[in-house]
Amino acid sequence: RYDVAEPSRLVPDVAKSWRVSDDGRTFSFELRPGLKFASGNPLTAEDVAWSLQRAVLLDKTPAFILTQFGFSKANVTERIKDSGTLALSIQTDKPYAPTLVFNCLTANVAGIVDKKLVLSKETGGDLGYAWLKTNYAGSGPMKLREWRANEVVALERNDNYWGPKSKVSRVIYRHVKEAATQRLMLEKGDADIARNLTPTDLDALAK
């Protein structure tokens, strides 16, 4: 992930260390031990490799972020693979700038998901794609509690997160189209933050 204080620097979450081969094609990673998904399942190199393979196999629009490195449905299981509980390697088709590869691995399409959980929700060979549209299988500091299209997204603290725990236990994003309604929610204390308020609303709130 990006360092908020210094966006040009990447900060590892799942990875403990990594190295690039002399020919610039093989990226080897060692994972942090003891990681868990929000479900409580252990996060292993198998999950990481499978998540990246899954993105290529599904071949949805964002997959080009990974397939630009020569991965295809035919070769991805050989080019991206785990070599133990905490080790995996990624082999590209030719040398690329490590910064490019690492930045692409921070993209949403390269997000690591819980293989065991996602496959238990698979329908019709979709690798859990339909289920993940409205559910969560990650390992970040917050987890999805509820999602209703054009209505609400509710997140809550993931107590299985390896790093510093979130200082807030829950965050709720509500889809409120009218600026006047947003202003009313702020005034009543039903919302802490609003966006797209009109100048009139802002002036009223400032009084």
Stretch-by-stretch model annotation:
Residues 1-22, 53, 60, 134-141:
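N-terminal lobe/hinge region of extracytoplasmic solute-binding protein
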Residues 1-4, 36, 53-60, 95, ...:
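Sec-exported extracytoplasmic/periplasmic mature domains
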Residues 4-5, 106-166, 170, 180:
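Gly/Pro-rich hinge or "lid" segments in bacterial periplasmic/extracellular proteins
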Residues 9, 13, 30, 43, ...:
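Extracytoplasmic/secreted proteins, especially bacterial periplasmic and envelope-associated proteins
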Residues 16, 26-28, 48-52, 87-90, ...:
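Short, well-ordered beta-strand elements
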Residues 19, 30, 49, 64-121:
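Surface-exposed binding/hinge segments that line
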Residues 130, 158-204:
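Ligand-site clamp/hinge motif
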